[in-house]
């Protein structure tokens, strides 16, 4: 929240269809008691514009096109309050979320996935130390009892970690980026999660018919090589195959799916798998549902969006003060 006269806040546009915009489809203005809020009831192609009028912040809705047209009836709801301030707004949006099926507590999710108990209160550890079991023992001896181990390990270590009380085993996974195999010789390594077979027919195409650029990788020659973005419609089937094979030898109880709730819902113009942003959202949620529903795993994703509340258990980055990694976050230890 920001005071309307805070001149450090620059005008901006926040999409409602991705984690790096507004993660819940509402905003409001209050004097501490009275105020109003706006609920975006058709949020898949919507955004909020934050600007200044007479030196004060104002917010207004914007509608993005669906495949170049309005596409469908757009709907938003204004709600006015005489008391309650931001708490009343949050309660009102909570009621709306319940009415559209987006409200699901961890207690409810625990009934379907008992491993959720190991998630609650756990520190999220990303560590590339080879002796994961020894490090976890050391952490627990130091008083850190509940640990989400997020880096993939060999089967024997996963099994040993599973046998330790308070430990939730997980690994990284991603269903967005596909590198052109013609670039492999220029790279320092080939990511094991790139679904190379999806190049080029599985790529998301923009309105010009060009493949969308995703994550970029440093090449040995200093050039940045972009991945293509996989069409979201193809991700759930890919995940079913990959996760089923992985779990045969690696009994993880959790899986972190990168980018799914951080990247925006995207249109695709490929003739074999066209989609609107609404289709994209549904496919992304289907992907997470494969993890949590079909395989019964604790499911995490990046940044977070309330569309994923029914199918995900946690988000990385939701509590960060800024998007992405801040310059002095500590990961770049050679520089800091």
Predicted regions and their residues:
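Carbohydrate-recognition beta-sandwich/jelly-roll modules
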Residues: 1-179, 253-254, 288-291, 298-299
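Glycine-rich loops and low-complexity Gly/Arg-rich segments
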Residues: 85, 101-103, 194-197, 279-282, ...
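Short, low-complexity, polar/charged sequence segments that are solvent-exposed and flexible
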Residues: 97-99, 168, 188-192, 274-277, ...
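The substrate-binding groove and active-site-proximal loops of carbohydrate-active enzymes
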Residues: 118-129, 142-151, 215-240, 265-280
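Short glycine-aromatic motifs
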Residues: 141, 162, 195, 310-311
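Active-site-adjacent "subsite" loops/lids of carbohydrate-active enzymes
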Residues: 171-245, 328-336
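Substrate-binding cleft/loops of secretory-pathway carbohydrate-active enzymes
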Residues: 181-189, 265-268, 300-336
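Active-site neighborhood of glycoside hydrolase catalytic domains
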Residues: 231-303
């Amino acid at each position: 929240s920001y005071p309307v006269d805070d001149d450090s806040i620059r005008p901006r546009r926040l999409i409602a269809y991705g984690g790096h915009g507004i993660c819940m489809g509402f905003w409001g203005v209050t004097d501490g008691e009275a105020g109003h809020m706006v609920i975006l009831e058709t949020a898949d192609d919507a955004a909020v514009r934050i600007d200044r009028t007479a030196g004060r912040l104002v917010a207004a809705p914007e509608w993005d096109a669906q495949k170049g047209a309005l596409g469908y009836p757009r709907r938003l709801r204004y709600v006015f309050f005489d008391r309650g301030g931001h708490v009343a707004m949050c309660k009102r949006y909570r009621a709306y979320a319940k009415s559209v099926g987006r409200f699901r507590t961890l207690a409810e999710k625990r009934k379907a996935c008992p491993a959720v108990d190991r998630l609650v209160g756990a520190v999220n550890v990303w560590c590339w130390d080879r002796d994961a079991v020894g490090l976890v023992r050391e952490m627990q001896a130091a008083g850190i009892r509940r640990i989400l181990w997020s880096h993939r390990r060999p089967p024997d270590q996963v099994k040993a970690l599973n046998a330790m009380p308070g430990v939730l085993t997980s690994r990284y996974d991603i269903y967005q980026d596909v590198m052109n195999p013609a670039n492999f010789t220029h790279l320092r390594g080939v990511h094991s999660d790139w679904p190379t077979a999806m190049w080029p027919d599985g790529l998301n195409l923009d309105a010009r018919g060009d493949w969308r650029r995703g994550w970029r990788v440093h090449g040995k020659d200093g050039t940045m090589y972009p991945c293509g973005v996989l069409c979201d419609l193809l991700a759930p089937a890919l995940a079913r195959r990959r996760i089923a094979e992985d779990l045969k030898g690696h009994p993880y109880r959790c899986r972190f799916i990168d980018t799914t709730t951080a990247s925006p819902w995207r249109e695709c113009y490929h003739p074999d798998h066209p989609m609107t942003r609404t289709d994209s959202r549904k496919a992304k949620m289907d992907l997470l549902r494969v993890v949590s529903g079909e395989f019964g795993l604790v499911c995490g994703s990046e940044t977070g969006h309330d569309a994923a509340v029914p199918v995900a258990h946690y988000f990385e980055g939701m509590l960060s003060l800024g998007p992405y990694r801040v310059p002095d976050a500590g990961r770049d230890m050679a520089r800091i």
